[in-house]
């Protein structure tokens, strides 16, 4: 289950105009523009984010001397069923000249450095970093069967392959003529194997998403001059993508990475981990020294690697701060003397001998400096930590968004943000071996940046990159990834708030159909799984491309409600499903009461965790929805439970807890809403994106089909939880536009390629009608 990320937003007032008693087009479609479809969404170019050295997500990376800027784009090519990822280079001098001129056209030219056609997410360009001012490094699947690390010279385009792994490079770092990289522990083969701790998904699809999500890895080091790779003395370990990070010291002697916390000292139980019964470092969660156990999936600690001899050991007798859930980015910096390292997002050892200091360290992670020779820990500053109030959502958490290091000045700048407030900054300066806060110096790093680049977008503003100049105080468009979008119609979006029967507050975005007419009721499709008030919603929240299709639906005459998450409703127990169901219901009822939504034409798309919430909605309000989709959904049933036998204990505990505790298999039938839907009349579309999901989803499909309910099951055998390939996206997103148009608008696309789909659905409609007669006669 994913970590909850809850966006918050500002209410935007809306002015409605009316002329007499005539229906008024409020958000009119431009007759010169074209409808926006799923195919158009797939073809859009997206600017992807980089992980920067200060921990922020940024749309561009400047070279160390800030003379050049790179961005990474992705667009779908449906004809070839690939995503084309391209690394583009800008000259910062051209940007400065452009900013200082009176002209707004043309924008600075972008030079293509490399383009990759990716069939899967792990085939594309990733882990981009500057080696120096002239060379950029990245991983990609180019001329071999597996992804490798490369460098490319920005002047002549010469590309150098840095690794030759026989199982694929998962992540890497390069500095001081050293390359350190993670690989899959073994190449795929067809020989018999011990199941061990492998998940069901890994077992039946060893090259699929499950294997890449939390794989068994090994760590290697080699020199950039072609030296043979040497394996780091670290056991084969289960390490998710989040923790496949590496930081090499400028001297080339050391590196920092993460390692699984497979065992720990008894005092780790004293760290105040939110939802302790699930995620705390209690003795029963220990993996007994097994680095491949699923128990270590989210339990890690920093490790120090001696690159001279390959030895690796824990940097601290303390866990990383990941499970503290305070959103601090994990960053590592190397002071210029090479004798210590600075790390963020880590708990600190409870061995100070001072009760008050130990208590403070128990509360949350910190940023600290560690002496490499002695292991001495010097706390620079504690990090914000979760309290009961922030956990409930009744108080806002001020979280760290970036941490910057100026090695010349020995200056560490920490930037924080709290909901509804501007960034705040603190600067910490090291003088004569001691750290002290220095007010007034926090803006030094920003003041040295002559040019900055940022992505700007909003509810009704599509994303573009803008450059800003410090000296001129100016701002201009740098890169429009989709100028062709000006030819499309997009539904107008607004903030939409409501309160449910439990007095929980909900927030979301409402997208009106194009050519919306005030006073007319429209079919409504609800999309779940989050909402961002500063996002131009095309598909789903955060760009999710499984099932969600907000703008194509709005262009097909639907009102679309994108529902945000609720801290008050996400209780991680048996109340969560019902609370989310009440939130969904209240949002729908408000739109009906305001005369916007047609009560007979309500549809809903759930995905992942919200699939389980939707089961409760169907159970409590069986007549609410005219059609529903549950895409790669967490359905929380007996089959899914037995498939998760090799999952971490905390995951299995969550699984049981959300239905009120499971003591024996029969409890599932009594407590899970899935087994209480055999009489529903709502047509159900199920989607599964990999073999493991298909087996779990088959249970609900079987239950509904056996009860002669209207159920459709679409399977994407080489899919991803968030669908990646253009063909899969068209099948899922386009299929859902067709699904809701069929059930809510009685419309069938005349495309001959879809004839079988509609023949299948017409049979479901007959079955639904027959069920209605039979059910009402009882």
Task: For each feature predicted by the language model, list its residue ranges.
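N-terminal secretory signal peptides that target proteins for export/translocation
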Residues: 1-10
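Bacterial N-terminal signal peptides
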Residues: 12-24
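Beta-propeller folds
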Residues: 18, 28-445, 450-451, 459-461, ...
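Non-catalytic accessory segments flanking enzyme active sites
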Residues: 58-61, 68, 73, 254-259, ...
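The conserved beta1-alpha1 loop
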Residues: 277, 528-529, 688
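Short beta-strand-to-loop junctions in surface cap/lid or active-site-entrance loops
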Residues: 508-520, 672-674, 678
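Active-site-proximal cap/loop segments of hydrolase catalytic domains
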Residues: 541, 546-556, 560-778
């Amino acid at each position: 289950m994913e970590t909850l990320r809850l966006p918050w937003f500002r209410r935007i007032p809306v002015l409605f105009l009316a002329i007499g008693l005539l229906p008024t087009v409020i958000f009119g479609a431009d007759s010169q523009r074209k409808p926006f479809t799923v195919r158009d969404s797939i073809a859009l170019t997206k600017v992807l984010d980089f992980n920067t050295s200060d921990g922020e997500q940024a749309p561009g990376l400047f070279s160390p001397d800030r003379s050049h800027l790179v961005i990474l784009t992705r667009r779908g090519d449906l004809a070839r069923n690939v995503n084309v990822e391209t690394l583009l280079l800008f000259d910062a001098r051209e940007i400065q000249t452009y900013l200082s001129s009176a002209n707004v056209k043309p924008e600075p030219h972008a030079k293509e450095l490399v383009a990759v056609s990716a069939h899967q997410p792990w085939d594309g360009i990733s882990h981009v970093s500057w080696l120096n001012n002239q060379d950029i490094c990245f991983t990609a699947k180019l001329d071999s069967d597996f992804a490798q690390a490369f460098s490319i010279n920005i002047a002549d385009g010469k590309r150098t392959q840095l690794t030759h792994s026989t199982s694929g490079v998962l992540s890497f770092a390069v500095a001081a003529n050293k390359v350190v990289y993670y690989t899959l522990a073994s190449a795929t083969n067809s020989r018999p194997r011990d199941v061990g701790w492998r998940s069901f998904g890994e077992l039946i699809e060893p090259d699929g998403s499950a294997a890449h999500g939390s794989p068994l890895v090994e760590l290697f080091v080699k020199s950039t001059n072609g030296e043979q790779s040497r394996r780091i003395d670290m056991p084969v370990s289960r390490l998710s993508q989040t923790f496949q990070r590496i930081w090499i010291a400028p001297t080339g002697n050391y590196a920092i990475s993460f390692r699984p916390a497979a065992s720990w000292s008894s005092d780790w139980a004293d760290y105040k981990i939110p939802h302790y019964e699930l995620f705390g470092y209690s003795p029963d969660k220990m993996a007994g020294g097994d680095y491949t156990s699923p128990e270590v999936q989210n339990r890690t600690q920093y490790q120090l690697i001696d690159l001279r001899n390959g030895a690796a050991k824990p940097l601290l007798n303390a866990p990383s701060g990941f499970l503290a859930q305070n959103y601090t980015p994990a960053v590592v910096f190397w002071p210029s003397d090479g004798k210590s390292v600075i790390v963020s997002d880590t708990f600190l050892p409870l061995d100070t001998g001072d009760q008050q200091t130990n208590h403070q360290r128990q509360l949350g992670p910190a940023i600290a400096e560690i002496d490499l020779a002695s292991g001495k820990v010097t706390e620079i500053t504690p990090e914000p930590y979760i309290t009961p109030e922030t956990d409930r959502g009744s108080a806002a958490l001020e979280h760290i968004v970036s941490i910057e290091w100026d090695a010349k000045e020995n200056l560490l700048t920490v930037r924080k943000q709290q909901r509804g407030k501007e960034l705040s900054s603190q600067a910490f300066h090291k003088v004569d071996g001691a750290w002290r806060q220095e007010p007034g110096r926090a803006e030094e790093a920003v003041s040295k940046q002559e040019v900055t680049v940022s992505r700007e977008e909003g509810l009704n503003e599509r994303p573009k990159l803008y450059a800003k100049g410090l000296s001129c105080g100016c701002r201009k468009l740098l890169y429009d990834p989709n100028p062709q979008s000006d030819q499309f119609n997009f539904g107008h979006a607004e903030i939409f708030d409501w309160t449910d029967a439990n007095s929980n507050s909900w927030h979301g975005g409402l997208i009106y159909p194009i050519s919306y007419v005030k006073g007319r009721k429209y079919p409504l499709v609800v999309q779940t799984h989050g909402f961002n008030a500063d996002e131009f919603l095309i598909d789903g929240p955060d760009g999710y491309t499984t099932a969600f299709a907000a703008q194509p639906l709005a262009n097909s005459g639907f009102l679309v409600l994108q529902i945000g998450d609720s801290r008050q409703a996400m209780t991680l127990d048996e109340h969560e499903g019902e609370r989310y169901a009440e939130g969904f219901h209240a949002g729908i009822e408000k739109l009906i009461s305001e005369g916007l939504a047609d009560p007979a034409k309500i549809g809903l798309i759930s995905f992942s965790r919200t699939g389980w919430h939707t089961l409760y909605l169907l159970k409590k309000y069986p007549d609410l929805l005219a059609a529903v989709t549950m895409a790669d959904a967490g359905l929380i049933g007996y089959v899914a439970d037995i498939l998760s036998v090799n999952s971490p204990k905390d995951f299995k505990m969550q699984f049981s807890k959300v239905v009120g505790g499971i003591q024996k298999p029969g409890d599932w039938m009594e407590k899970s809403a899935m087994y209480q839907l055999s009489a529903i009349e709502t047509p159900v579309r199920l989607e599964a994106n990999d073999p493991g999901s298909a087996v779990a989803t088959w249970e609900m499909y079987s239950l509904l089909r056996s009860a002669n309910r209207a159920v459709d099951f679409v399977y994407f055998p080489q899919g991803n939880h968030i669908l990646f390939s253009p063909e899969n996206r068209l099948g899922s997103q386009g299929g859902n536009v067709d699904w809701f148009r069929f059930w809510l608008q009685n419309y069938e696309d005349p495309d001959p390629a879809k004839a079988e789909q509609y023949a299948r659905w017409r049979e479901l409609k007959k079955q639904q009608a027959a069920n209605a007669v039979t059910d009402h006669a009882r």
